[in-house]
C-alpha cells in the first residue's frame, strides 16, 4: 500500500523551530513529526510513502534516505514547482499512486492522533466508494468546517464552513483513504481538496466519514504543539506506560530520553518531554514543556508551557512561560523572565520579555 | 557643645512610602540593615562634643520608637530624646516650638536633618566650613549638584561661586533656577531662632487680619520657603557643597537605592556588616547585609545590594538581588526575588518569582538622582519595585511583577503591574 503525505511549504506557523529544520523533522515527543505518521503507516502495511513537498530540502531528503533503510520501505519525494494546494499534489504523484489499483492514504503532515490506518482500510473497503475522510469531534464546531453525514453508514451529505447554528460537531481530521478513481477528478493545478473536490464527491455519494476514536490534534503551531504533546503522552500512559519516566520528583506523564541527565531536587511534570543529551541541573521545575536535544536548563529555572529548541541554554532562575518558544541554539541569560517570547535561532537574550513578542 | 535635631515627621507624612509605613514609622524603616535614622544618629555620635540628639515629630509615643531610642543611646553613647509636636508644625515650626529644649545647655551650634535622606553626612567638614564662613552669625545648608531637570523637585540654591554665600533660595521651582540643591541637612547657630521668630510674628500679623484663624496655624513654619528664602542674600546663609553620596528616601524604591549607597559605605565604615562567601555559607555577590539571626541556606545566592532582616529564612537555591527582606520573612526553595521589598513575616513560595523594576538614577549622569515622584502616569501604574506588605503570602510557582501587595494578603495566582488591596 501507498501513502501520500502533504508536507507543503515552509511551516511558518511553527517558527522559530522550522527556521532550523523542515517541519516534518521537528521533534514531537522525541521523534520527528513525520516519523510518527510514517511508522504508523508501516505498521498498517504501507511500503511506499510519497512526500508531497513544495520546497526543496536537502535535510529532509537525506533524513528520508536513512528512514528508507531503517524501515525497509520506499520513500519518494514529489516536488512541486509551485504550491499545488491539498489536491494538486495527488495529480502530480499520479504515476506513483497508480502503480497498482490499491486504495492509498493521504495525510496532512502535522496531524497527531492514534492513527487508525487499518480500520480505515476496512471501512473503505466495506463501503466500496471512492473516498473516506476520518472525522473527529470538536467542542466548538463554529470555529471549523464541519462534516454532515449519515450516522449509520457514514455517507457524507455536505460540508458547512463555520456553522452558526449547530449542524454537526465533526470536522475533517486531515486523514483520508482514496481509491485511484479519485485521481480522475483532480487536475494538475493548484486545487483545494476540501473546497473543490470533496463537495462534488459528497454530492455523488462517493465520500464517507469514519469517526476517529481517541485524541487528535493539528500541531502546526506552538500552542497546539504543546496541547498535542499532552494528549500524546496521555495515550502513551494508556498504551506504553513503561515508556514514561517515574520516580521521585516526576509528576504525571513525563518522557525522558535515556541520554538526558537530570539533577537533584527537580520537579518535572506533568506533561514534559525531555530530549536526548539534555541536561537539567539541580532544582529545576518544568511543566507542560518540550525540551529538545542537547539543551541545558540551569539550576532553579522554572519553565511552563514552553518549547526549548535544540542546543539552547536556559540560565539559572530564569522563568519561562505562556508558550515561550526558543529556536535552535538560543542562550537565555540568568534570572530573566520570558513571557510568550518567540526567540529566533542563535540569539542571546539578556533582557526580560515581560509581554509576548518576537525576538529577532 | 553641639546638638542635633532630626525631623522625623509623622504618620500623615510619607504616603509615598505606603504600604510599608503602615507597619513601622518611616524613620525606623531599615535601610542597609539598620533603621533609617540610625545612620543619622551614628554620624552625629562621631562628631566630637555633640552631646544630644533630639528627634522632633508628630508621631504618638510608641513602643517601636522608644525601644529604638533606648538601644541607640546605649550603642552610640549619646543622649537621645523624642519631642512630640501637638500637630504638624512644618520643618521650621517644630524646632521653633522646642527652641528652649534645643538651646538648653548652651550649644554653640546644632545640626538639623531631615530623617528621609541618605547621606555620607559630612558633619565635621560642615563644622569647619561654618567656622570659616561667619561662625555664630551664619547658617550652613548642605548642598549637592543635581541635573537640570531633576533640580526642579528640590530646594534650589544660587550661591556666590567664591564665598559660597546663598544669594537666592527657591523651593521646588517651576522652571530651572540652579543645579545646586538642598540636601535637607543644616548647621545652625542659635541666632537662627531670631529669624524664625520673625516669620512667626509675620504669620501672627497676617492671620489676625483673617477671620476664624486658629492660633495653631501661626506656629506652622517651613524652614525652606519661609526662612531660607528670606535669609538668602543677607550674608548669613552659606552652602557647603558635597560630592559624597546623597539621596532622598521618599518611595520604597528609593529605600533600595539608599541601601545600596549605605552598603557600599560599609566597606570602609562597617566591614563587619558585609557578608562574604564562606565555606558552608551562601554565595555572596557584591554588598550584602545579613542579620546574624537570619537562616540562609548555603545553596542560596545573594546580592548585590541585599539586606536580610532578623529571623529571615532563605531556603535552598533561592536567588535574591537588589532587595530588602524584612524580619520574619520566609523565602522558600528556588524562589527568585529581584528589586523587591519583602514585608515582615511574608512568605514567598517555592519557585515563585517576585520582581520589580528599579527606578535607579541614570547611571551615565553623575548628578542624576532617583525619581520617586508618581506612582501613576497617565492612569497606569508606573513599573516600580515590587513591595509585599507585612504578612503577605505568595504561593509557589507564581510570578509577581511590578506590583504592590497590601498587608495580610494571601495571593492565589500571578499578578503584574497591579496594586493588590
Ligand atoms: N505539497 C503541498 N502540501 C500542502 C500545500 N498546501 C498545504 N499543504 C499541506 O496540506 C496540509 C493541509 O494544509 P492546509 O489545508 O493549508 O491546512 P493547515 O496548513 O493545517 O492550516 C498541511 O499538511 C500542509 O502542509 C501545497 O501547496 N503543497
Ligand atoms: N517634625 C516635623 N517634621 C516634619 C514635618 N514636615 C516634614 N517633616 C520632616 O522633614 C523632612 C522633609 O519633609 P518635607 O519638607 O515635607 O518633604 P520634601 O520637601 O519633599 O523633602 C522629612 O524628614 C519629614 O519627615 C513636620 O511638620 N514636623
Ligand atoms: Mg521640603
Swiss-Prot record, chain A:
<feature type="binding site">
    <location>
        <position position="218"/>
    </location>
    <ligand>
        <name>Mg(2+)</name>
    </ligand>
</feature>
<keyword id="KW-0548">Nucleotidyltransferase</keyword>
<protein>
    <recommendedName>
        <fullName>Mannose-1-phosphate guanylyltransferase catalytic subunit beta</fullName>
        <ecNumber>2.7.7.13</ecNumber>
    </recommendedName>
</protein>
<dbReference type="GO" id="GO:0009298">
    <property type="term" value="P:GDP-mannose biosynthetic process"/>
</dbReference>
<feature type="region of interest" description="Substrate-binding domain">
    <location>
        <begin position="2"/>
        <end position="222"/>
    </location>
</feature>
<dbReference type="InterPro" id="IPR045233">
    <property type="entry name" value="GMPPB_N"/>
</dbReference>
<feature type="active site">
    <location>
        <position position="162"/>
    </location>
</feature>
<dbReference type="InterPro" id="IPR029044">
    <property type="entry name" value="Nucleotide-diphossugar_trans"/>
</dbReference>
<keyword id="KW-0547">Nucleotide-binding</keyword>
<feature type="binding site">
    <location>
        <position position="110"/>
    </location>
    <ligand>
        <name>Mg(2+)</name>
    </ligand>
</feature>
<dbReference type="InterPro" id="IPR056729">
    <property type="entry name" value="GMPPB_C"/>
</dbReference>
<dbReference type="GO" id="GO:0005525">
    <property type="term" value="F:GTP binding"/>
</dbReference>
<keyword id="KW-0460">Magnesium</keyword>
<dbReference type="InterPro" id="IPR018357">
    <property type="entry name" value="Hexapep_transf_CS"/>
</dbReference>
<dbReference type="Pfam" id="PF00483">
    <property type="entry name" value="NTP_transferase"/>
</dbReference>
<feature type="binding site">
    <location>
        <position position="110"/>
    </location>
    <ligand>
        <name>GDP-alpha-D-mannose</name>
    </ligand>
</feature>
<dbReference type="InterPro" id="IPR005835">
    <property type="entry name" value="NTP_transferase_dom"/>
</dbReference>
<dbReference type="GO" id="GO:0004475">
    <property type="term" value="F:mannose-1-phosphate guanylyltransferase (GTP) activity"/>
</dbReference>
<keyword id="KW-0479">Metal-binding</keyword>
<feature type="region of interest" description="Hexapeptide repeat domain">
    <location>
        <begin position="245"/>
        <end position="360"/>
    </location>
</feature>
<dbReference type="GO" id="GO:0046872">
    <property type="term" value="F:metal ion binding"/>
</dbReference>
<keyword id="KW-0342">GTP-binding</keyword>
UniProtKB/Swiss-Prot annotation, chain B:
<protein>
    <recommendedName>
        <fullName>Mannose-1-phosphate guanylyltransferase regulatory subunit alpha</fullName>
    </recommendedName>
</protein>
<feature type="binding site">
    <location>
        <position position="85"/>
    </location>
    <ligand>
        <name>GDP-alpha-D-mannose</name>
    </ligand>
</feature>
<dbReference type="InterPro" id="IPR005835">
    <property type="entry name" value="NTP_transferase_dom"/>
</dbReference>
<comment type="function">
    <text>Regulatory subunit of the GMPPA-GMPPB mannose-1-phosphate guanylyltransferase complex; reduces the catalytic activity of GMPPB when part of the complex. Mediates allosteric feedback inhibition of GMPPB catalytic activity upon binding GDP-alpha-D-mannose. Together with GMPPB regulates GDP-alpha-D-mannose levels.</text>
</comment>
<dbReference type="GO" id="GO:0009058">
    <property type="term" value="P:biosynthetic process"/>
</dbReference>
<feature type="region of interest" description="C-loop">
    <location>
        <begin position="357"/>
        <end position="385"/>
    </location>
</feature>
<dbReference type="InterPro" id="IPR050486">
    <property type="entry name" value="Mannose-1P_guanyltransferase"/>
</dbReference>
<comment type="similarity">
    <text>Belongs to the transferase hexapeptide repeat family.</text>
</comment>
<dbReference type="InterPro" id="IPR056729">
    <property type="entry name" value="GMPPB_C"/>
</dbReference>
<comment type="subunit">
    <text>Component of the GMPPA-GMPPB mannose-1-phosphate guanylyltransferase complex composed of 4 gmppa subunits and 8 gmppb subunits; the complex is organized into three layers, a central layer made up of 2 gmppa dimers sandwiched between two layers each made up of 2 gmppb dimers.</text>
</comment>
<dbReference type="Pfam" id="PF00483">
    <property type="entry name" value="NTP_transferase"/>
</dbReference>
<dbReference type="InterPro" id="IPR018357">
    <property type="entry name" value="Hexapep_transf_CS"/>
</dbReference>
<dbReference type="GO" id="GO:0005737">
    <property type="term" value="C:cytoplasm"/>
</dbReference>
<feature type="region of interest" description="Substrate-binding domain">
    <location>
        <begin position="2"/>
        <end position="252"/>
    </location>
</feature>
<dbReference type="Pfam" id="PF25087">
    <property type="entry name" value="GMPPB_C"/>
</dbReference>
<dbReference type="InterPro" id="IPR029044">
    <property type="entry name" value="Nucleotide-diphossugar_trans"/>
</dbReference>
<feature type="binding site">
    <location>
        <position position="248"/>
    </location>
    <ligand>
        <name>GDP-alpha-D-mannose</name>
    </ligand>
</feature>
<dbReference type="GO" id="GO:0016740">
    <property type="term" value="F:transferase activity"/>
</dbReference>
<feature type="region of interest" description="Hexapeptide repeat domain">
    <location>
        <begin position="274"/>
        <end position="421"/>
    </location>
</feature>
<keyword id="KW-0963">Cytoplasm</keyword>
